[in-house]
């Protein structure tokens, strides 16, 4: 398995629609103001967070159960910023829609800008032939409120290409998150 370069990422996005919308260079500023970078980097793609958030709340004193998840555990927010309460959690989604090739596994890592502020981004691997908007999980590990910026970089995708295509892809087995759009809650 080898990590793929900016040239490969650019080609796959432009010729095969692997990432849409696609930004073919790294953006660090917009309209004379600094932003948290997004777009193609040397060996990855920095994704942006859309302006749709679900912030974890304890208003209804629900129990967090991944097999029987109560949507009332979240408050929906549509904004250019999201404030995550101390020691809490929020979900969002990428601006970008992904179509992962059959011989590629994609790993997502949080950006250091957020990690150095105590904000952890978690995403499980994007499996071969998975497609959709990526649901992003943000954990605020601090005892202070934390801010997430929509339409700016939040995580980096690394593309690992195998020597051979897998026998059974995510699409083949009818994965439960295939084709997801919007912020997607747990499914069983």
UniProtKB/Swiss-Prot annotation:
Q: Which InterPro entries match?
A: dCTP_deaminase (IPR011962), dUTPase-like_sf (IPR036157), dUTPase_trimeric (IPR033704)
Binding site residues for dCTP: 111-116, 135-137, 156, 170, 180
Its top-level enzyme class, in one word, is hydrolase
Note the Pfam families from the entry.
Answer: DCD
Q: Which residues form a coiled coil?
A: none
Cited CDD domains: trimeric_dUTPase (cd07557)
User: Keywords of this protein's UniProt record, alphabetized?
Assistant: Hydrolase, Nucleotide metabolism, Nucleotide-binding
Report the Gene3D superfamilies cross-referenced here.
Answer: 2.70.40.10
Q: Where is the active site?
A: 137 (proton donor/acceptor)
Catalytic activity, reaction form: dCTP + H2O + H(+) = dUTP + NH4(+)
A Gene Ontology molecular function term of the record: nucleotide binding
What Enzyme Commission number(s) does the record list for this chain? 3.5.4.13
Pathway(s) annotated for this protein in UniProt: Pyrimidine metabolism; dUMP biosynthesis; dUMP from dCTP (dUTP route): step 1/2
A GO biological process this protein is involved in?
A: dUMP biosynthetic process
Q: Which NCBIfam families match?
A: dCTP_deam
Q: What does this protein do?
A: Catalyzes the deamination of dCTP to dUTP.
Q: How does it assemble?
A: Homotrimer.
Q: Which PANTHER family match?
A: DCTP DEAMINASE
Family per record? Belongs to the dCTP deaminase family.
This chain belongs to which protein, by name? dCTP deaminase
Which gene carries the instructions for this protein?
dcd
